[in-house]
């Protein structure tokens, strides 16, 4: 009996967010290192932005806490 037949996947396969191909275990949630790098490059270039709430004020560095 082959021991590989008893191995279950860690997570269900989902489509790659970049190209739609099935994801790979070693580059999850992407299908390849290429798609993973494309996504990282978009984050580094600022193409993706997580908006902050407008009512949040940043504390001044000069003010004591």
From Swiss-Prot:
Pfam family name, one: YacG
Sorted UniProt keywords: Metal-binding, Zinc
InterPro entries tied to this protein: DNA_gyrase_inhibitor_YacG (IPR005584), Znf_NHR/GATA (IPR013088)
Keyword Metal-binding tagged: yes
Coiled-coil intervals: none
The record's free-text note on cofactor binding: Binds 1 zinc ion.
Source organism, top-level taxon: Bacteria
Function according to Swiss-Prot or TrEMBL: Inhibits all the catalytic activities of DNA gyrase by preventing its interaction with DNA. Acts by binding directly to the C-terminal domain of GyrB, which probably disrupts DNA binding by the gyrase.
Renumbered residue ranges of the record's region Disordered: 1-24
A Gene Ontology molecular function term of the record: DNA topoisomerase type II (double strand cut, ATP-hydrolyzing) inhibitor activity
Name of the protein this chain belongs to: DNA gyrase inhibitor YacG
Reported cofactor(s): Zn(2+)
Family: Belongs to the DNA gyrase inhibitor YacG family.
Binding site for Zn(2+): 16, 19, 31, 35
Subunit structure: Interacts with GyrB.
GO biological process terms on file: regulation of DNA-templated transcription
């Amino acid at each position: 009996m082959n021991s590989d037949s008893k191995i279950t996947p860690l997570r269900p396969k989902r489509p790659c967010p970049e190209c739609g191909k099935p994801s790979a275990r070693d580059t999850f949630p992407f299908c390849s290192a290429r798609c993973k790098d494309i996504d990282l490059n978009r984050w580094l270039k600022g193409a993706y932005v997580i908006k902050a709430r407008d009512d949040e004020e940043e504390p001044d560095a000069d003010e004591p806490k």
